[in-house]
Amino acid sequence: MKAFALFFVLSLYLLPNPTHSKFNPIRLRPAHETASSETPVLDINGDEVRAGENYYMVSAIWGAGGGGLRLVRLDSSSNECASDVIVSRSDFDNGDPITITPADPEATVVMPSTYQTFRFNIATNKLCVNNVNWGIKHDSESGQYFVKAGEFVSDNSNQFKIEVVNDNLNAYKISYCQFGTEKCFNVGRYYDPLTRATRLALSNIPFVFVIKPTDM
């Protein structure tokens, strides 16, 4: 069973990864509560992911999907705050710590298929200290909807959900849901030929990841 599960996750990475094509989204079906959704999101140790704590979000596929997520500034000519979310090229790079905060203020653990806010917990200058919350911005040149970091208001930054891909492997994906609607889309990888970076963007093919504690 585990071998089949690993094959399933790996097959997601063997599908074409678009570069020049514009994003033509396939809307996901709304997630309904099931028995499995009563299980909290788990890290690679099988421990519950705690609300408001820091974790690494790392590609579930060793050698094929890269490493963890990082906040960078791809435009070196710009003096603006780092706002680009990329997948590290190295399998050994866990990326930057990410704080996962449920929209429900009373939640103590992170539950799948519920709204979350993601923010990078990294050292930055005073001008950029609040420019770490995830959101979605459209890029007219590429036609992509990129995951960006910035001063997003709560209504725009807590529209993400962690969805279960495989229970046996504690593998997950992220979906983005438009505010006030049930329209949800996969967050996947997009290889940017201009910057030669793999960026997070809305995609028909999800970025499948595992969650690592930052104290490992």
UniProtKB/Swiss-Prot annotation:
Predominant subcellular localization, coarse grouping: other
Location of the protein in the cell: Vacuole
Record's signal peptide: 1-21
InterPro entries linked to this entry: Kunitz_inhibitor_STI-like_sf, Prot_inh_Kunz-lg
Gene3D superfamilies: 2.80.10.50
One MF annotation (Gene Ontology) recorded for this entry: endopeptidase inhibitor activity
Entry keywords, A to Z: Signal, Storage protein, Vacuole
Tissue: Accumulates specifically in tuberous roots and tubers upon tuberization. Sporamin accounts 60 to 80% of the total soluble protein of the organ.
One Pfam match: Kunitz_legume
Gene Ontology cellular component terms for the protein in this record: vacuole
Top-level lineage group: Eukaryota
Family note: Belongs to the protease inhibitor I3 (leguminous Kunitz-type inhibitor) family.
Summary of the function given for this chain in its UniProt record: Major tuberous root protein.
PANTHER family: CYSTEINE PROTEASE INHIBITOR 8-LIKE, KUNITZ TRYPSIN INHIBITOR 2
Stated name of the protein: Sporamin B
